[in-house]
Amino acid sequence: MQHATRGCCLTVNSSKSKLTVAHLLQKLPRAPQYWVAFSGGVDSHTLLQLLAEARRQLPGSLAAVHVNHQIQQQSGDWEIHCRSVCEELRIPFHLLRVQGKARAGESPEAAARTARYRALAEWLPTNAVLTTGQHQDDQAETLLLQLFRGAGPRGLAAMPENSALGRGRLLRPFLEISRKAILSYAREHRLRWVEDPSNTDTRYERNLLRQRIMPELQQHWPGLGKVLARAAGHQADQIELAQTLAALDYRACCRSESGCLSVSALLCLSPARQRNLLRYWLEQAGLPLPSRVLLERIRAEMLSGRQDASPLVHWPGAEVRRYRDGLYSMTPLPPHDPARRYRWDFREPLSLDQAGGILSATAVTGGGLRVDDGAGTMDIRFRQGGEALQPAGRHYHHRLKKLFQEWGAPDWERDRVPLVYSNDALIAVAGFCVCEGFQATAEQAGLDLQWSRMPES
């Protein structure tokens, strides 16, 4: 831990540094609460000190949050240190404990970062602003790491200064400030901070870059950190333009409220715009983005395949399917047992987890399933094959398979659509039709049956 006696006042020569209260206040959007992600390190401590000085000028309250990853032996000491600093500054302190253990093939650094941001996103109060101490050198390192991994513009844009996080915003006000300037400020103002010993372990990519590669590069290209951070800003501008174009293409290619894309409309776009739109579409659906290889598989198999084919491209947490002219994105469908049966009284929505949806009923008049038919004796089943029915208003029985084709039901959904039975008679196909003789007419009370995908968890 770096120890020093705290100075009693805060002064910064604004002609030489952007580390001033005035500059920081210009960065802050209006919010009811401002939080500092306080690790105890020099960057977040400097940020906390500046905001503590500015607290009377803030439109909202100020507090600090510390994330204990419970990985290193010193974690408990760091937690105590952060709490002590906040007590001295009379700043409310909040603690989050997470399990940041790495999974197979994942680096400890990445695991800790993922766990930290997940916990912060889930916890952050509505409309609050969370500030972090990441600076210009961090930005330069992030850009280089992304470049070494072959990232596109999104990765090369590195860390945005202002972005959404959970129900609030994430702000990085130090991205124009160098590590050297922050250290100079901290020493001048006699701050005390903790040092993570793992920061010197060059087995980790970022540490290797920081300890060995960047110093060598900076000898040949002075000011490299500032230049790389500026390059990241240029990439961020390109991302904004690409997002604007994708939004326009989405409006032109989106077919329905379900958000599926028209294959024929996609084919009118250039390959670059197709890729751009597909990423945007998946992002809007809240799904993890695929690799470039998988993105090309989507283009090759979904856009160029036979019209009657039903291709599937999947990756962890997401899948893309095609039916006729529609491209559909979704979370992976759960395993389904079509032999399962359920009893339902219509009063409450029925969650059919294994079918991947929710069955519900809305009271209507003059339509839907007649209420007095088999009340309390409804069986919910699934297609076994060979079912036939006569939809209300039709003169003949039809195979359910043919009706699904007529209705445009995607083939992967057909075995999951709930079939409503009364005394072994098929009386309704949820979300599609009521059978002849079981529909409410004129002023009769009825039930409109809806079948919808399970909300994403």
PLM-predicted stretches and their roles:
Residues L10-P215, T244:
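Core alpha/beta nucleotide-donor-binding catalytic domains of modification enzymes
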Residues W78, A119, W221, Y280-W281, ...:
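Tryptophan-centric aromatic hotspots in well-structured domains and transmembrane helices
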Residues Q2-T5, C9, N13-D43, R55, ...:
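AMP-forming adenylation/ATP pyrophosphatase catalytic core
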Residues F148, Q218, L282-G286:
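Hydrophobic/aromatic-lined pockets within catalytic cores
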Residues G76, E106, R203, N207, ...:
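Non-catalytic, surface-exposed connector residues within folded enzymatic/regulatory domains
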Residues E176-L261, A265-C268, R279-Y280:
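Contiguous mid-protein beta-loop-alpha structural module that forms a pocket-lining wall or clamp
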